[in-house]
Amino acid sequence: MYSTPLKKRIDYDRETFTASASLGGNRLRNRPRDDQNNGKPNLSSRSFLSERKTRKDVLNKYGEAGNTIESELRDVTTHVKISGLTSSEPLQLASEFVQDLSFRDRNTPILDNPDYYSKGLDYNFSDEVGGLGAFTPFQRQQVTNIPDEVLSQVSNTEIKSDMGIFLELNYCWITSDNKLILWNINNSSEYHCIDEIEHTILKVKLVKPSPNTFVSSVENLLIVATLFDIYILTISFNDRTHELNIFNTGLKVNVTGFNVSNIISYERTGQIFFTGATDGVNVWELQYNCSENLFNSKSNKICLTKSNLANLLPTKLIPSIPGGKLIQKVLEGDAGTEEETISQLEVDQSRGVLHTLSTKSIVRSYLITSNGLVGPVLIDAAHIRRGMNALGVKNSPLLSNRAFKIAKIVSISMCENNDLFLAVITTTGVRLYFKGSISRRSIGSLKLDSVKFPPTSISSSLEQNKSFIIGHHPLNTHDTGPLSTQKASSTYINTTCASTIISPGIYFTCVRKRANSGELSKGITNKALLENKEEHKLYVSAPDYGILKNYGKYVENTALLDTTDEIKEIVPLTRSFNYTSTPQGYANVFASQYSAEPLKVAVLTSNALEIYCYRTPDEVFESLIENPLPFIHSYGLSEACSTALYLACKFNKSEHIKSSALAFFSAGIPGVVEIKPKSSRESGSVPPISQNLFDKSGECDGIVLSPRFYGSALLITRLFSQIWEERVFVFKRASKTEKMDAFGISITRPQVEYYLSSISVLADFFNIHRPSFVSFVPPKGSNAITASDAESIAMNALILLINSIKDALSLINVFYEDIDAFKSLLNTLMGAGGVYDSKTREYFFDLKFHDLFTPNAKTKQLIKEILIEVVNANIASGTSADYIVNVLKERFGSFCHSADILCYRAGEHLEAAQKFEMIDSKISRNHLDTAIDLYERCAENIELCELRRVVDIMVKLNYQPKTVGFLLRFADKIDKGNQAQEYVSRGCNTADPRKVFYDKRINVYTLIFEIVKSVDDYTSIEQSPSIANISIFSPASSLKKRVYSVIMNSNNRFFHYCFYDWLVANKRQDYLLRLDSQFVLPYLKERAEKSLEISNLLWFYLFKEEHFLEAADVLYALASSDFDLKLSERIECLARANGLCDSSTSFDQKPALVQLSENIHELFDIASIQDDLLNLVRNETRIDEDYRKQLTLKLNGRVLPLSDLFNDCADPLDYYEIKLRIFKVSQFKDEKVIQGEWNRLLDSMKNAPSPDVGSVGQESFLSSISNTLIRIGKTTRDTDVVFPVHFLMNKILESFIDKSSAADGSVCSMFLLAGVSHLKLYYILSRIIENSEGNVELAKKEMVWLIKDWYQSDSDLRGSIAPEQIKKLEKYDPNTDPVQDYVKDRHHGLK
């Protein structure tokens, strides 16, 4: 899996450009000059600093700062305002610099803005080859002659030959009559000849196929147009093997008489358009498909611009009839005009617009739709003249009626400019830019937006007296601006259709130059003159992107380059080096030079292929290494430092170049340019001030960091700009046919190696030269620091970022070393059923490269966990832990610490323990003990997933007791201050920072509980054997005992409480009653307040320990608690509590016991009343059903206050018996109120309907009142106020109107059954009879029955009175009362 660190660096080396001998510090003086100037510089009067245009949103964040020593030098660089320079974390600080510089790079000015050159275009121009020296935009890199065999075949052409370049294939094509020759650009000896085509080839074109038409390997179609047919061939090209295969699809369309002249396609839809040299300005579409039916063939053609009638008539029919040509012109909407044909087709692939150029220099623009073309919008000479008048550009001989002719049209992509649609190149070298608008249904009018005239010798002579150096005022001025001289030039470039504009904005054309003159020729009229005095040159004019970026000034570097012969075609071989896909930042070549391949342009001549390469800024700087002032003048010190750093680290450069670049990067140009941080308050060369330059927020607006720092940050920014915001890992859901989800890394391994090698070189460079750039880093949070201190802080942060990037890329490279295993691991960890939850998976796959380069704690943790899994897999495969540790430390130290090393070694011992388990258990145990010791030492760095894996292995090795002990110690290690206990004690606030420690402990304890559960389950399965009724411990029981012994020996209160909580949660609360631990009782007492289950356990635990008073107290509290208990259960608790009170024999607890007993009885009485109420309400029919259920629910819960029972239930529902019981329990003593309740009770019984229709009403009443009186009397008879016997006796006696209606003793018997004594009844009846109260006769009758019943039940009375006295008692008379003397003699009082 592991390999040695990457040693080979990426070679960016290019062929060194040879600067002209005259090149010095006058780079901006290289203006057009003539031979009479004697080599003196021709200077412009317009400063690059005069007009700086920057977006407002960029200006809000960035300021302009100067970082030069000499007043005549000025550098426009970026001063990034970062808040909290001294308080930010270094990686975060460096990341902010990178992100802000990247923002600046993405927002450089738009390339083509008419304000740039409304008064003429500024050129750096020389009419000599290589006259611009180091600033020549292109250099010829390669010349490949067309093979002689190919030229020989072309020389035999009889009818027509043509040539061009297939950019997509890197092949040149050459036609000769009916032969098509494909010549490999990369291998000049390889070519293919297709000679099976029957007729002369007129045009060939490579196009993209329609989507979903051919197999995926077919990426291009070769369209071959002959005199009679258009053939559609497929081409498959293998980029790796460069194998080219051409297949005949059998698709062809008849085009007899068309003379096809142009073919082009719209890549988005695959539509193919073509025109014919004999078909006027019509545009046709070539249609094809893979199916054929009765009405449609596989391929056909349709005219998109003719009228519908003309499209229906046969093509050959109309011209053949008399006057047919005139009819055809009328149908085509072009009657009365001369013959006009299409000379060029151009498609704007970004907007879906087709432009056509006709032989009369008329441009027609159509909107491409699925049904054809919409339009056209026309651009003709009159339209252009009106546009030029509006722009103030009049009377230019280059655009006169005689000279005006369009040579080429070039579309401009939306990515390059939102407004500009089209560039038109005239034969005089003028470039016209048109802007427009577009909707879904049509194109708006195209208006002339700007004009670029070519450089002229006249403008050169006018400008030669306007010399200046950037930062100086012009020495002389002239009233005539460059626009007037450029548009009035009498010399011009003879532009052909081979001219082009390559994005971004690079203009190429071919010129013919006289051998003895510096002027450009209009044309060639004599062949001998061409051979002897003229030569072909390549004219190139490229925008100076650096000046545009830094100064908002548009300048073009224009030069002539050598070429071999007449130019046939100019095409780019590589993609554009645009930095963004938006107009802002699009043309920032400084930002894209490290991420985009240098632009290469292929120029095809009649006998060779020439390749020209764009000179990147580092190549320009290298050419100026001895005197970089011109580079600094144009592009600024920050760019110069960035480029110098790049050259100092570049592979395969000479020591001279590297040392010179390093010298400039370190010290600038001594005495001329200094590179150091400075205060904005400094002036001249005053040393940095030492006062506090920071405000209270920590921002250092008063300090401008050095160009060296910004140059270094720019290089880092641009090296990783393409991946900085990209996701690191990719994830794709499995389709129905795939077995598992697809995981991987978003960049390829070659990309990883490229980035890693680049950053490694930078890391090595800064590690070596760090003391030169970082002096003293002030402590974090410092306020009073100097500019030098601020520079050290920023540079130190950047160096840390470089090393962090290196470590991150090394990590990814390690993953790539066994990518299949890594993908499988990701599926295990991050898959649908993986270890991590959905939030973690989402976070992981949202990780971007800048998150990995500047990782926060969560990112580090996640990557570390994955890395541990990778390491474990390698250890399992037999790799040494020491070797792994060394590799990890060497490659990415920030992801591998000393604690990680201990973890890896512990993992190695754990792996060894598994291997020796079956061989030697003693050795296995030794390895296990060592692993446990190592894991404990690095406990704070072990993640839960890794800990779980370790525990699983230990359990498999039957090491449960020591595993539990290890986990207990592990928990103490990760929470040394027992912060988890503090977190719980403070109320478990989720915002409490101690929650982290709580969660960690809980996770560890969960692993212990899982072990306990497995041991318990195993024990329950295995029955313990017994011999002679003596139990013998089985292995499972012994294991369980040892595990529980380790648990009970723990002195951590928090662990015990968590363990008991787990037992209760898993319905194992009975275990608590069997545990011998000092923490059980405190736990039960604390948890009982909030848990019914624990409360039950608590009283039972106390009862088991014979703490009866405390158990009764718990039961009493439980009965009166707010727990969800039914009333019957509360009554049961009270009954149990009362029984426990009676069981207690402790003398010391007697007072507390008496008090508790009284409380229990009081609550029990109330609960009994509530229970009776509950039963009554359940059967109540007088109230609403919903209210009855609500009242029942209320009563069948906690014991309610007597007032609630009375007011809410007993009184509204007239439960008189309940009310009387409430009076008794509440000790209510208002006789009037109580007697009133008795009256209402008795009245209710009188008025109650008899349940037996046939019974006598008096008997029913007597039975009812007897039952009621007995029930009430049993509970209230000891309270005379609540159970007034005298009052009740009178009321009952009065209720019997007829004394014969009542059986003897019917009244007294009910009182006796209610618990009233005979003596008390005797006194009450005597008083009634004596005072003649109420029904005296019935009272006397009841007295007779009472005395007899008393005599029978009282032995003492029988011994005092003769039986005859009782027998002869028939009617009561106070004078003959047999009991009167007995009562008086015995001095009986009322009982």
Curated annotation (Swiss-Prot):
It is a peripheral membrane protein. Keywords: Acetylation, Membrane, mRNA transport, Nuclear pore complex, Nucleus, Phosphoprotein, Protein transport, Translocation, Transport. GO terms for cellular component: nuclear envelope; nuclear membrane; nuclear pore; nuclear pore inner ring. GO terms for biological process: mRNA transport; nuclear pore complex assembly; nucleocytoplasmic transport; post-transcriptional tethering of RNA polymerase II gene DNA at nuclear periphery; protein import into nucleus; protein localization to nuclear inner membrane; RNA export from nucleus; transcription-dependent tethering of RNA polymerase II gene DNA at nuclear periphery. Disulfide bonds: none annotated. Gene3D superfamilies: 1.10.167.20, 1.20.120.1050, 1.20.58.1780, Nucleoporin, helical domain, central subdomain, Nucleoporin, helical domain, N-terminal subdomain. Residues 38-48 have a biased composition (Polar residues). InterPro entries: Nucleoporin_Nup133/Nup155_C, Nucleoporin_Nup133/Nup155_N, Nucleoporin_Nup155, Nucleoporin_Nup155_C_1, Nucleoporin_Nup155_C_2. The modification Phosphoserine is found at S1034. Residues 21-50, 1372-1391 are annotated as: Disordered. The modification N-acetylmethionine is found at M1. It is found in: Nucleus, Nuclear pore complex; Nucleus membrane. GO terms for molecular function: DNA binding; RNA binding; structural constituent of nuclear pore. Belongs to the non-repetitive/WGA-negative nucleoporin family. Present with 4420 molecules/cell in log phase SD medium. Functions as a component of the nuclear pore complex (NPC). NPC components, collectively referred to as nucleoporins (NUPs), can play the role of both NPC structural components and of docking or interaction partners for transiently associated nuclear transport factors. Component of the nuclear pore complex (NPC). NPC constitutes the exclusive means of nucleocytoplasmic transport. NPCs allow the passive diffusion of ions and small molecules and the active, nuclear transport receptor-mediated bidirectional transport of macromolecules such as proteins, RNAs, ribonucleoparticles (RNPs), and ribosomal subunits across the nuclear envelope. Due to its 8-fold rotational symmetry, all subunits are present with 8 copies or multiples thereof. NUP157 may be part of a NPC subcomplex containing NUP53, NUP170, and NUP59. In addition it may bind to MAD2. This is Nucleoporin NUP157. It comes from Saccharomyces cerevisiae (strain ATCC 204508 / S288c) (Baker's yeast).
